[in-house]
Amino acid sequence: MSSDASTYRLEDVLSSFYRVEKIKKINYHQYISKAQNDQWSIQMEFMLRKQDPKTLVALLSRDLWCFSINDDPVPTPPAIEHKPVSPDKIGTFTADYSKPNLPPHYALFLKALRRKIYINLALGSHNKLIQFGNACISLSGVPNYLVQLEPHLFVNGDLTVSLCAKNMGLVPMKEENLEESFLSKHALYLAPSGIRMHLAPASKQGYLITPPKHTELLLTTLSVSHGINLQNKKNLKWVAVVPDLGHLNGHTPTIASYLTPLLEAKKLVWPLHLIFAQPVADIENSTSGDPSEFHCLQDALDAIDDFIQLKQTAAYRTPGSSGVLSSNIAGTNPLSSDGAYTEQFQHYKNNSISSQPASYHSVQETNKISPKDFSPNFTGIDKLMLSPSDQFAPAFLNTPNNNINENELFNDRKQTTVSNDLENSPLKTELEANGRSLEKVNNSVSKTGSVDTLHNKEGTLEQREQNENLPSDKSDSMVDKELFGEDEDEDLFGDSNKSNSTNESNKSISDEITEDMFEMSDEEENNNNKSINKNNKEMHTDLGKDIPFFPSSEKPNIRTMSGTTKRLNGKRKYLDIPIDEMTLPTSPLYMDPGAPLPVETPRDRRKSVFAPLNFNPIIENNVDNKYKSGGKFSFSPLQKEEALNFDISMADLSSSEEEEDEEENGSSDEDLKSLNVRDDMKPSDNISTNTNIHEPQYINYSSIPSLQDSIIKQENFNSVNDANITSNKEGFNSIWKIPQNDIPQTESPLKTVDSSIQPIESNIKMTLEDNNVTSNPSEFTPNMVNSEISNLPKDKSGIPEFTPADPNLSFESSSSLPFLLRHMPLASIPDIFITPTPVVTISEKEQDILDLIAEQVVTDYNILGNLGIPKIAYRGVKDCQEGLITTTMLQLFSTFDRLNGNDTISKFYNMKQPYVFVKKHHELIKVKHDSQPFIKFLNFRPPNGIKNFKSLLLSSSFKEDCLSFAPTLSQTYINQELGFCELLKLTNEDPPGLMYLKAFDKNKLLLLAAQIVSYCSNNKNSIKNVPPILIILPLDNATLTELVDKANIFQVIKNEVCAKMPNIELYLKVIPMDFIRNVLVTVDQYVNVAISIYNMLPPKSVKFTHIAHTLPEKVNFRTMQQQQMQQQQQQQQQQQNNSTGSSSIIYYDSYIHLAYSRSVDKEWVFAALSDSYGQGSMTKTWYVGNSRGKFDDACNQIWNIALNLASKKFGKICLILTRLNGILPDDELMNWRRLSGRNIHLAVVCVDDNSKISFIDEDKLYPSFKPIYKDTRFGGRMDMTRLYDYEIRDIDQDIHGIVFQHPFPLAHSQHRCAIRSGALIKFKKCDGDTVWDKFAVNLLNCPHSDSTQLLETILEEFRNLAALNVWYGLSDGEDGHIPWHILAVKKMMNTLVHTRVKIANTSAATVHTATSSSIILSDK
């Protein structure tokens, strides 16, 4: 493959940036409120926006800021009492601003620019594109994409806007969704603020209420401030909502309890049209462990054998018999449905009664089926108490209830006149009796001693409705078509699309299956074949009118058991139908007992037994449901394959992640001072006492943060010297130079809202209402303003929130204003929240189980499939040449041109593949890192020696499969020379390496622990040190709940064993049961599991391999002349950065990599550590809850771990501190500033693999595999005589480096901008026209003068560490461009945030009272 990056055409790369203006200067005026009038700035903003929606205006505290571009005039507020308002400060600034901490006027300018764009998009779209948080949501089609336009000013003067889209599954609320079944599965948000809220029922009848008093005021304010015009909307519905004040303050609710109702009672009225719902991801019901329909090869062969047997036994069909119409024949015919089977068919009858296809799922299942429920080796108490006749009944319990004549399927349509009296066949009465008896048994029998597990009982219809609302995984091209030019967004993005009636009609095919498929006779079928082929669409549209796929349960034909879904036996053969009933009756059977079996009369055979339309056996109703659902090979229309995606935007809000929100909307506490907010509605530090909130998520909550208190100090406005901006272009270490008073020192960096807020309601009300009445609502008279200001009420509490006389709780507009002027960033909303959420119990000092769970997730080689948690990613826009966005932007700005790669990229180069150390024939050698798939062929061995251990697999199902898996894994481990794996044999009765338990109850687990202690005690005398014991626990389902359950089981065993023998080391490895049972698992996968076990055994810092040190290609010698020149450069640099103490020496002896992240709800901290070669690696998880002290302790531990690794290095050390998710909050930065010292040079980096900035590759020739993907003829033939001249390359591991011309702002901290930006990119395996897989790297400070060289060094370090992903088991090669330690943090974060944590022996438990589906083991 060609690696000459110079041949790549950067002009064929499309960025997500659009140039809108060329900036020479930006003018600003600052107006400070006079006479302590808190409302004046808000009034002026509304007046200016009413006069011209294109006005660039923003608020900060009590100040009003007005901006203009280049020579445009700065907007001026209306005069008061005929006196013009003069600005308190006038200034200009250019694109040459300081970094990384942006000046306050620049942040406010970006905020004003964003508001201007969103307001005009809403006005131009006629409410089809309205603001939602710091984005806008499209209401013109499904799904409702979130579109984000982020402005940024490059150093060269280009004012640009980046464009991206995101699908979080948000759907607008409708009146029919106001029911508990919908609300219990969706999180609700207010628009345009994006604040989390809950619905409050107005009465027992429903949620809708009468419009409030100030309806016109609220709607007018929406129109002025956001361009959302609902004043002319007919039948506008109103509901009472309970807003989450914690989210208003910047605290995201606990993700693991995201749907837990609030205890607050504060309500306000909001239009139903501006409420959006986000569906919960139901992992238990939507995840299948194996995407294949067959778990193993035997299932596939059995299915084929069933068809063959069915075809062969068709020869025994005898015309003329009927077990339904003739009672005499039914009683004596050995082949009838009630007679005894002959010896030739006895085994078929037994198989059909005692088995059912393991891979078949009934459409009426409501519980999750675990493998042990239908394991042939499971002999639980449920089965032992069932008689054979009882075991027969459940085979029919999942049959759809179709309200049709049961004999109708056994006759022609013209002959279906049989009386219902003939329906009472012995088969049916036996079924009813068995159903009743089995129902009694199941109600009385329970698994004694077993650990209780709560099954999810949600209907399939609700599941389908939820799945339709979940984000769908579409290709980039589909997203672009829907958003920017095609499909249903004609008005929004330009192009039109045809109706999707074809899709709807096709959908009915899969949704409903009717009796027409089964009742059609051969004659009808042959006659209709032509018409079916010609009118396929019409036929499919008519399907499902008679018998729906989900039958009605109002009039059931048979007695069924609700909630009973267990399969009591294994496979069930297809030959469940009595053979004589497979043909229509014509003559009676010949009944001579001594005669041979009758043979079928020769006649025309059917074309093929496998043809779905030609093969139409006559099936008695409720006998077998596999044909009703399409057969064993069918797929249920409910089962939708969800993309295993996840990426949660981890943006801190409570202390400093709010800075994104502050920068975007300026609605900090100072903004809310300008609102008439009642004292009981004011966010405050004592929110839990004022609002009766006792939930843990509100502990230590503080009020809304202020830009004035964090990054934008009021003093900075007065001390900004425009002339100093150009002299301080890049403060390389200015990230550490934040003034001490800029960073809050309190428990929380949020500040309480000033209690001296003056009411504004009557002021705003009179202004807006009077202007609403007049013919020209944009005119504001000075007298009106003056009179309103003088007549403000003196009561600080404002007007009461509720009007006592109004039974529907009419709310005043003062309660609504905070939720109008506040705009929450999307980073404060979790992309995914799941159900059910497991519970894990920890103590204040011991959190080892969290690291245990994290270790299973990190090193799984993706066999856990991300535990079924979806992934939400930003999507790039391929084309935006027409449509609403382009039209609006051209109206607002002079141009709207897309920037290409050559406009944004300064350096594009192919990065060399690193080498790793391995052993071959007892010699240490270096090989390229992409040789990992060939380990078993090349006989590579770990260079750091072997690791021995003892293995024990604990299982409660599929004993035979586990019995073969344990020795196979052990032998694989030994054959790869990873060490010796001994299969633990605790008792003489148990096979080596396997302990089979019927249930994991605590008594049995304690007995097992005692056996392990006894075994170790006996063997300790013979050997000095007992090797580590690895306990393997199969996962019945690859879900987070199941993983936590198994971790709790292991923790019980470990605690008991370590209490008796502290020196014994126990380790856990979880493997999906589907992996164990699948006979098609390759040797490569067994080798990967063996290597992952090797990596987790002690010492954990020693992995299978590490990066090999490469000698430099050239050595630079310094002469005296060069040294003098370098000293002069250093002096110049010192003068430029006199406050940073930067050094021009750029060489470091060692690099240490520390990656960390914090969850959106700020309750989790994750970290991973490594050196440049992957040695000394470790991962760590902390649950800090809402405690600031625990977070500080976690930071201290992170720093101590880094210093411990640094103490083992020599020379000059650079610690690369990496924060995930493109954000660096102030409180975290304050910790690193406090902990940093002179011994270690600190380079702060923010990274993100799911950034808002995207690049689309349209080059067709580079890399050289693109033409081959387009046409295989471009690939040359291999010359077998020159095999040594060829090189095997894994294009997934072919990484390129990029250095951008200009630095980018942080994705979720836009008051900070990098001093240098770069990326690692990977080309997708196709012929082009795709978005790069990009790993963005933003350097925030530089310990020396050359930031570009430091960035390139960091990119090279990251590229080397990314080569260890496959070797360490973090991925199967997909994420070859992400360093292993960053990928480890990402995997831990995306999983553990969905786990509820219970702190033992603590009154302030952080788990809610909701029931849990995990095991909680406790002594009773």
From Swiss-Prot:
Show the ranges annotated as biased composition (Basic and acidic residues): 429-439, 454-484, 670-683
Superkingdom field:
Eukaryota
UniProt entry tagged with the keyword Nucleus: yes
**Key words, A-Z:** Activator, Nucleus, Phosphoprotein, Repressor, Transcription, Transcription regulation
TM spans, by residue?
none
Gene Ontology annotations for the cellular component aspect, listed alphabetically: CKM complex; mediator complex
InterPro entries in the record: Med13_C, Mediator_complx_sub13, Mediator_Med13_N
Annotated GO MF terms: cyclin binding; transcription coactivator activity
Sorted alphabetically, the Gene Ontology BP terms of this entry are: negative regulation of transcription by RNA polymerase II; positive regulation of transcription by RNA polymerase II
Biased composition, Polar residues: where in the chain? 416-427, 440-453
Effect on the protein of changing S608A: Loss of function
Bias category Low complexity: which stretches? 494-508
Places the protein is found: Nucleus
Q: What does its PTM field state? A: Phosphorylated. PKA-dependent phosphorylation at 'Ser-608' is enhanced by activation of the RAS signaling pathway.
Q: Mutating S1236A has which effect?
A: Loss of function
Q: Which Pfam families match?
A: Med13_C, Med13_N
Sites bearing Phosphothreonine, chain numbering: T601
Positions where Phosphoserine occurs in the chain: S370, S375, S425, S608, S636, S748
Q: What are the start and end residues of every segment in region (Disordered)?
A: 416-511, 653-691
Q: Where is the composition biased (Acidic residues)?
A: 655-669
Determine if DNA damage is one of this entry's keywords.
no
What is annotated about its quaternary structure and interactions?
Component of the SRB8-11 complex which consists of SRB8, SSN2/SRB9, SSN3/SRB10 and SSN8/SRB11. The SRB8-11 complex associates with the Mediator complex. The SSN3/SRB10 and SSN8/SRB11 kinase-cyclin pair also associate with the RNA polymerase II holoenzyme.
| Recorded family membership | Belongs to the Mediator complex subunit 13 family.
Task: Quote the function comment for this protein.
Answer: Component of the SRB8-11 complex. The SRB8-11 complex is a regulatory module of the Mediator complex which is itself involved in regulation of basal and activated RNA polymerase II-dependent transcription. The SRB8-11 complex may be involved in the transcriptional repression of a subset of genes regulated by Mediator. It may inhibit the association of the Mediator complex with RNA polymerase II to form the holoenzyme complex. The SRB8-11 complex phosphorylates the C-terminal domain (CTD) of the largest subunit of RNA polymerase II RPB1 at serines 2 and 5.
- In Swiss-Prot or TrEMBL terms, this protein is called Mediator of RNA polymerase II transcription subunit 13
Could you tell me which species this protein originates from?
A: Saccharomyces cerevisiae (strain ATCC 204508 / S288c)
The gene behind this protein is: SSN2
